[in-house]
From Swiss-Prot:
A divalent metal cation 1 binds at residues 102, 113, 242. Monomer. This is Methionine aminopeptidase. GO terms for cellular component: cytosol. Keywords: Aminopeptidase, Hydrolase, Metal-binding, Protease. The gene is map. Removes the N-terminal methionine from nascent proteins. The N-terminal methionine is often cleaved when the second residue in the primary sequence is small and uncharged (Met-Ala-, Cys, Gly, Pro, Ser, Thr, or Val). Requires deformylation of the N(alpha)-formylated initiator methionine before it can be hydrolyzed. It comes from the Bacteria. The keyword Metal-binding applies. Its cofactor is Co(2+); Zn(2+); Mn(2+); Fe(2+). It comes from Aquifex aeolicus (strain VF5). One of its GO terms (molecular function) is metalloaminopeptidase activity.
Length: 258
C-alpha cells in the first residue's frame, strides 16, 4: 500500500480528530487511580468521545494481524503489558501500577492516535525513570520527523535514547501512518533491528504516529491468552508514549498535543 500525502486542509482535519484524542486521553489519564477498573476508564473514553461527536477508532477495528475485531475503545496495558491490553471490569488498578493508555478517534472522516503512560499513585524510582526515558525518546524521535530524513532516523533516535537509560526498545512493534485510517503505511519501528530494506524517505504531507515502547529488561514479547494483550517476555515493566505528527516544510507539527 502506498504512503499517502495530505494537503494542508486535510492535515487540519486530522488535527481536529487528534485534538479530540488528546482531550479524551487527558481526561482518562486523570482518572487513573488505585481502585479504578480499566473498564471504568473505557466507559469514560466512550462517553467523552461521543460528547465530542467523534467515534472511537479502535472499537470494532480489525487489524491485519487478527481474525477478530477489537472490542474496546481503549488499549490499557499495565506493568509488564506493552500494548493492546483489553479493558476489563475485573482488571482493577493498584497503587504503583504503570498504566499505558492508547486511544484513537475518527472525526469527519479522519483519524488521530496517541498514547500516554502514567503511574497510579506513587510509583517506584525505576518506573519513574522508565516513563521519563520513553517520553524523552518520543520527543527526540519527533525532532527527526523532517522532509528528507528516513523512517529509520526516527527509529535510531528512539533506540539511542533507550540505550542511554539502559532500557530496551520493543521488537516488531512501532508507529505507523495516520490519516483517512488510524493505521496506514509506513511502519515506523522502535527497534533498529526492524529497519530492514524498507526504509522510506519522509516527505512533506506525510502524517505518522510515532510511538516508542520501552522496557526495563527485554526487547522480546509474548502474547497473552486473551488474543490481544502483548507482554514483555521476562515480565519487566514497559511504557508507551505516542503522538500523531505531521511532516511539514517548517518541521514536525504535533497534532495530538493539547
Amino acid at each position: 500500500m502506498a504512503i499517502e500525502l495530505y494537503s494542508q486542509r486535510e492535515i487540519e482535519k486530522i488535527r481536529k480528530a487528534s485534538q479530540i484524542v488528546a482531550e479524551v486521553l487527558h481526561i482518562v489519564a486523570e482518572n487513573v487511580k488505585p481502585g479504578v477498573s480499566t473498564w471504568d476508564l473505557e466507559m469514560i473514553a466512550r462517553k467523552e468521545t461521543e460528547k465530542r461527536g467523534a467515534k472511537p477508532a479502535f472499537l470494532g477495528y480489525k487489524p491485519p494481524f487478527s481474525d477478530v475485531r477489537y472490542p474496546a475503545a481503549l488499549c490499557i496495558s499495565i506493568n509488564d503489558e506493552v500494548v493492546h491490553g483489553l479493558p476489563k471490569k475485573e482488571k482493577v488498578i493498584k497503587e504503583g501500577d504503570v498504566v499505558s493508555i492508547d486511544f484513537g478517534a475518527i472525526y469527519d472522516g479522519y483519524a488521530g492516535d496517541s498514547a500516554i503512560t502514567v503511574i497510579a499513585g506513587k510509583g517506584s524510582p525505576e518506573a519513574q525513570k522508565l516513563l521519563e526515558a520513553t517520553k524523552e525518546a518520543l520527543y527526540n524521535a519527533i525532532e527527526k520527523a523532517l522532509p528528507g530524513k528516513k523512517v529509520g532516523d526516527i527509529t535510531k533516535a528512539i533506540h539511542e535514547t533507550a540505550e542511554k537509560y539502559g532500557f530496551k526498545t520493543i521488537l516488531r512493534y512501532g508507529g505507523h501512518g495516520v490519516g483517512r485510517k488510524v493505521h496506514q503505511e509506513p511502519f515506523v519501528p522502535n527497534n533498529v533491528k526492524d529497519i530492514g530494506k524498507k526504509n522510506p524517505r519522509l516527505r512533506q504531507g506525510m502524517v505518522i504516529a510515532i510511538e516508542p515502547m520501552l522496557s526495563i529488561g527485554t526487547e522480546e514479547t509474548v502474547e497473552d491468552g486473551d488474543g490481544w494483550t502483548v507482554k514483555t517476555k521476562d515480565g519487566s515493566l514497559a511504557a508507551h508514549f505516542e503522538h500523531t505528527v505531521a511532516i511539514t516544510k517548517k518541521g514536525p507539527v504535533i497534532l495530538t498535543e493539547l
